[in-house]
UniProtKB/Swiss-Prot annotation:
UniProt xrefs under SUPFAM superfamilies: ATPase domain of HSP90 chaperone/DNA topoisomerase II/histidine kinase, HSP90 C-terminal domain, Ribosomal protein S5 domain 2-like
HAMAP family: HSP90 (MF_00505)
Lineage: Bacteria, Pseudomonadati, Pseudomonadota, Betaproteobacteria, Burkholderiales
Keywords: ATP-binding, Chaperone, Cytoplasm, Nucleotide-binding, Stress response
Protein name: Chaperone protein HtpG
InterPro entries according to UniProt: HATPase_C_sf, Heat_shock_protein_90_CS, HSP90_C, Hsp90_fam, Hsp90_N, Ribosomal_Su5_D2-typ_SF
GO cellular component, one term: cytoplasm
Keyword Membrane: no
Function: Molecular chaperone. Has ATPase activity.
Organism: Paraburkholderia xenovorans (strain LB400)
NCBIfam families assigned to the protein according to its UniProt record, in alphabetical order: PRK05218.1
Keyword set includes Chaperone: yes
Amino acid sequence: MAQETMSFQAEVKQLLHLMIHSLYSNKEIFLRELISNASDAADKLRFEAIENSALYENDPNLRIRVSYDKDARTITIDDNGIGMSRDEAIANLGTIARSGTKEFFGKLSGDQQKDAALIGQFGVGFYSGFIVADRITVETRRAGLPASEGVRWESAGEGDFAVEQIERAARGTTITLHLRADEDELLSSHRLKSIIQKYSDHVALPILMKKEEWDAEKSAMVTKDEDETVNQASALWTRSKSDITDEQYKQFYQHLSHDHQDPLTWTHNRVEGRSEYTQLLYVPTHAPFDMFNRDHRGGLKLYVKRVFIMDDAEQLLPAYLRFVKGVVDSADLPLNVSREILQESRDVKAIREGVTKRVLSMLEDLANSDNEADKEKYAGFWKEFGQVLKEGIGEDFANRERIAKLLRFASTHTDTPEQTVSLADYVARMKPEQTKIYYVTADTWQAATHSPHLEVFRKKGVEVLLLTDRVDEWILSFLTEFEGKPLQSVARGDLDLGALNDEEKEAQEKVSEEFKPLVEKMKEALKDKAKDVRLTFRLTDSPSCLVADDGEMSGYLQRMLKAAGQQAPSFHPILEVNPEHALVKGLHADSANFDDWCHLLFDQALLAEGGALEDPASFVKRTNALLLARANEA
């Protein structure tokens, strides 16, 4: 078949340009990425060969070979893994076939350092070769296809690439990098070995290079025909923890996740009992850009007796821990396990429970530590992954109490947007007579902290949690109490902030009686908007506020459902008015513009809690009319 020239997918062109300019300062990663791809290709061959051993083609010893040619100025990475067909080469090397691509490009800022971290999260893989090469040649043949169906793919990393069919006896893939003019320092056995040992020492396959020895007669290093293995070539998780350095754990994480940054923390142990498995689990430092994308691929790499089975085995982790990276190697599962079998397997259920408990323990160790560095780590974790962890309150009944202790919130105690207050912190600071944990929900911290509902709490020195994440209202339907203390919205039902003395009771009853006719008339004026109108003594500075009855949907949750395009019942709140406020005191049931004042008090309260007016034009018209009337009176 003749050579065919094709254009890169638009996103590939953009990624290549960004990557070459943003990642050059860390150019060594090209070799890590290409070796990682070669390792994946070997894993895939092992997996497919479980059903069809003929794919080994009498060459079962899998390996990766790295070589260089000073005269040609090339570096070559060769593997005898699964290889690619023509269609696979075009798809894998010419397009980015993954979710979240649009979100990724939308988050790029132009700041080289920040963009480099983001590109690392996205995963550059094969394209990293263009950081050091101005041309890349790939020759490959998929295992099981005839030698006549080899493929050559070549590109200068600009707008297009060429593909042609070739004769190739060996299965697998050979990638040749034609180096840029200023990259000659890479053409050294010592340099390449040092990069391999730095980034890929843990790769389970042997990485081979030709031995070099000093030739005294030539006064130079001479390449021998003999191979040497330049990495440890054993799966990191199978080694004893005492034999693994922190640096090796970090490098394995980067190999596993394609993240250029170090992990926040990790745990490594072997579990024995009903199910036997080894787990090496990492919590990243930063959330991936597509964490909240419905198609986000989460989960762990699953191995059975060191044989790779699948990426993203989401059955091993609950969705609220989808940020965790790592490896689980089972001794009990069958080698031909499928995703369908995983869903029904008792062994998998036991592994999932064990992995979940291990991750929660890892987070608890950070959250409960007296060490300042660990405290900072947990604060960083919460900032990145707190919203995701909160989902566990509704999804994981068995671990709900453990997750509740890990939650962090903003609070009137700290009066900052930082979410640093735990429920245990709140309970420890409760007033002697206080029986409930109070909270307010709002779209933003500013809206929460300025809520009229907080006025009486500030006056009495009672702490209120400020909940501003979209998931908060949902999780509170599952988290109704903590350590025997009910959670109570300050915008629901009647509040009991302590017993009143006889004098206070009598005074409030007297005021209620005085305002009874006015309140009845307000109910009539607002019958289409408000479920009820009543006096309140919870306000100190605001004339009015909206509350919902216990068990009814709040205005915040209704707005959230609407924003998500879901059906939400109509919102008919209770309007509470402050009899001590001048606006309420000045209301007269027989005044000509009484109805307008009632609607204004309702609309103001709605705006104060972050709600949207159904008819903004009428609100403006009504407000102007009332201002004009007051101006004329003056």
